[in-house]
Amino acid sequence: MASQLTDAFARKFYYLRLSITDVCNFRCTYCLPNGYKPGAVNNNGFLSVDEVRRVTRAFSALGTEKVRLTGGEPSLRRDFTEIIAAVRENPAIRQIAVTTNGYRLARDVERWRDAGLTAINVSVDSLDARQFHAITGQDKFHQVMDGIDAAFAAGFDKVKVNTVLMRDVNHHQLDTFLAWIQPRRIQLRFIELMETGEGSDLFRRHHLSGMVLRDELLRRGWIHQIRQRSDGPAQVFCHPDYAGEIGLIMPYEKDFCATCNRLRVSSVGKLHLCLFGEGGVDLRDLMAEDRQQAALEARIAEALTHKKQTHFLHQGNTGITQNLSYIGG
């Protein structure tokens, strides 16, 4: 086995975010307000099941133990269950997660579980059905809520819910969210609105630092938890009176990048060292056959030597990320 992926700043990488499509059926104001427009896909289309199997096998040989399937909306893939099963074949991958808008969750969550899915993140930016519709462009709030209930019924011990924190949209609804998670094992993660190439105006209007919520949680007696090595970037808080937890993802906070442990592969097979980096390294030509695995591992390891110490969001440089559906946020 090759050595653990480590960059020039001694950061170790245990976590792969793998986009399997950039298509999404929602039109969220902060991501795809005008809906999905085909652009990134060439004649080869999105990664096949076999390509997913090969690239995750290569990453696991380099120490990856967690894979998150993202999009776009990953459940739009007709072969999504097969993709989960292909990743599950590899015993070195301990966690297989999905980030979904939740609209197919109630229908399919049991099949995903049986295929090997171990964790679920659902995007919910408001607990008000009308506001949910306004943000997403889809009147599917109750369908998504039913999906979260179905995930618990299917045996998932915890469900993570992602909420993009937006000034004058949902930042004043903390009490509503806290009441929702008090009896439920939901980790509610507030994600700071991030500037993208297509979203600069929205960012200027609605960005709010997660530190505002952090200070309020600490004032109310919430306790900051210790992070595990394959966890995502959230600072997680718990409270003895709540079954749920709160996570804060604050990419503009000082030293956010110091604990980076994740790499990204796009739905067309490009390795992205940072969500807000440039270009990407093409891996797809080395995913065609099993015998290419050593070369694929070598290209991944070499690419990591070029990973920067930090993103440049503070300078307004959003890199190649025009919207968050492109490489899965």
From Swiss-Prot:
Keywords: 4Fe-4S, GTP-binding, Iron, Iron-sulfur, Lyase, Metal-binding, Molybdenum cofactor biosynthesis, Nucleotide-binding, S-adenosyl-L-methionine. [4Fe-4S] cluster 2 binds at residues 257, 260, 274. SUPFAM superfamilies: Radical SAM enzymes. Residues 8-234 form the Radical SAM core domain. Pathway: Cofactor biosynthesis; molybdopterin biosynthesis. It catalyses: GTP + AH2 + S-adenosyl-L-methionine = (8S)-3',8-cyclo-7,8-dihydroguanosine 5'-triphosphate + 5'-deoxyadenosine + L-methionine + A + H(+). [4Fe-4S] cluster 1 binds at residues 24, 28, 31. SMART domains: Elp3 (SM00729). CDD domains: Radical_SAM, Twitch_MoaA. The keyword Nucleotide-binding applies. S-adenosyl-L-methionine binds at residues 30, 72, 123, 194. It is an enzyme of class 4 (lyase). Belongs to the radical SAM superfamily. MoaA family. HAMAP family: MoaA_B. Catalyzes the cyclization of GTP to (8S)-3',8-cyclo-7,8-dihydroguanosine 5'-triphosphate. This is GTP 3',8-cyclase.
